[in-house]
């Protein structure tokens, strides 16, 4: 689950694999760490992507001063967190990729991940939306109480599109786990993922596998695309598997030549019978012959000229049908505005300060007194905690001094 979550945020087909894969490992490591710590400290309710983002920004950009063999060294705070974890920790293993990287390579990994998850720091609406949970995915499969979850994704804010793909991925995985509790590993109620503008959604991890095995668990996908090129662009080689595992094809209209050719081919051919005649130009026809040939049921060029309100459906193991449909706006169904729907979202009033994980508890364990080989006692504290610095300075005996460093303050006293 955590691996697929990391894939949603870091997948990038345009860059070299090392950067998204390294960024994914770093993100997975931080998620696993905060989950483990949240469980141990009783703060699981505060584990969210907003907390992950703040953990990364705060600890990834600050250094602490450590004494190693009598020498002061700047050590990244994020490195210190994972170094302190016990051997065999899943979070520590996932962090190894970025731990091994140095210099510009390490900076590029950190920059890549910072860009991938920046939405949780720059978009307060998303931070609040993901700060808690009001949805029990298992209720979607309750045959006695039908339920639908409607996602409203603003087309003008592409940065928010990743949330829709993330929701679909997590919902699918949760329902698969729930299906395993039933005989035959099949949900008691069908669940449809109706994904409008599927071609514009951020890639959903393992989509080809989901659509292949999902039907056996009563998990069905309805994918709406403008043309098949969108599918090929997004999913590359997996696009063919996705297409071939759709049991129903519904064609409304397209001007894309390749899409029309594919659909015309999927509809199949029809057989026509015709007669040919031969003979001299100025005499009676002396020969005639009958023959048969196959032609497309509907030619690609005819598909693009279908009248408005017409649709062609090809169902698996059935002959295609030509039908008509009524546009939604003619059905007289009242639609709610986004503002009306938002009134039911309790999380929009959440204070982010109350939902963030208590990161100070992590800082307190990182900065501990250290004694060097000359007897000097050191204690590092963050510069943004002036009250703590003053308190520690007053606690030390006469002659203690404070050295101000770029990131933190190092307090030391003579032996």
Region roles according to the model:
Residues 211-312:
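Conserved ATP-driven motor cores of ASCE-family P-loop NTPases powering translocation/secretion/packaging/pilus
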Residues 1-219, 234, 244, 301-322, ...:
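P-loop NTPase motor domains
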Residues 412-415:
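Conserved small/polar residues in nucleotide/adenosyl-binding loops
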């Amino acid at each position: 689950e955590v691996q697929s979550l990391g894939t949603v945020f870091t997948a990038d087909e345009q860059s070299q694999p090392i950067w998204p894969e390294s960024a994914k490992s770093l993100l997975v490591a931080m998620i696993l760490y905060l989950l483990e710590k949240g469980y141990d400290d009783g703060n699981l309710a505060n584990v969210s992507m907003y907390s992950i983002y703040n953990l990364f920004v705060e600890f990834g950009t600050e250094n602490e001063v450590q004494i190693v063999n009598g020498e002061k060294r700047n050590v990244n705070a994020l490195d210190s967190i994972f170094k302190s974890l016990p051997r065999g920790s899943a979070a520590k293993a996932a962090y190894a990729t970025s731990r091994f990287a140095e210099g510009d390579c390490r900076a590029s990994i950190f920059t890549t991940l910072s860009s991938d998850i920046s939405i949780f720091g720059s978009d307060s609406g998303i931070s609040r939306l993901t700060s808690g949970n009001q949805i029990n995915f298992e209720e979607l499969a309750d045959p006695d109480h039908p339920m639908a979850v409607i996602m409203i994704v603003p087309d003008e804010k592409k940065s928010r599109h990743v949330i829709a793909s993330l929701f679909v991925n997590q919902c699918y995985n949760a329902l698969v786990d729930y299906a395993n509790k039933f005989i035959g590993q099949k949900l008691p109620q069908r669940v449809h993922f109706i994904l409008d503008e599927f071609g514009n959604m951020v890639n959903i991890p393992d989509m080809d596998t989901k659509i292949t095995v999902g039907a056996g668990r009563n998990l069905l996908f309805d994918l709406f695309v403008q043309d098949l090129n969108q599918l090929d662009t997004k999913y590359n080689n997996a696009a063919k598997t996705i297409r071939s595992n759709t049991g129903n094809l519904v064609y409304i209209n397209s001007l894309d030549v390749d899409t029309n050719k594919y659909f015309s081919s999927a509809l199949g051919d029809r057989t026509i019978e015709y007669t040919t005649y031969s003979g001299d130009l100025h005499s009676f026809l002396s020969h005639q012959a009958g023959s048969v040939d196959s032609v497309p049921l509907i030619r690609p060029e005819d598909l693009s000229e279908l009248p408005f309100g017409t649709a062609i459906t090809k169902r698996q193991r059935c002959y295609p049908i030509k039908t008509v449909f009524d546009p939604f706006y003619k059905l007289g169904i009242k639609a709610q505005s986004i503002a009306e729907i938002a009134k039911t979202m309790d999380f929009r009033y959440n204070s982010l300060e109350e939902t963030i994980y208590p990161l100070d508890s992590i800082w307190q364990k990182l900065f501990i007194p250290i004694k060097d080989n000359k007897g000097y006692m050191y204690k590092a504290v963050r510069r943004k905690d002036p009250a703590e610095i003053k308190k520690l300075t007053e606690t030390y005996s006469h002659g203690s001094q404070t050295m101000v460093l770029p990131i933190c303050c190092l307090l030391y006293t003579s032996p």
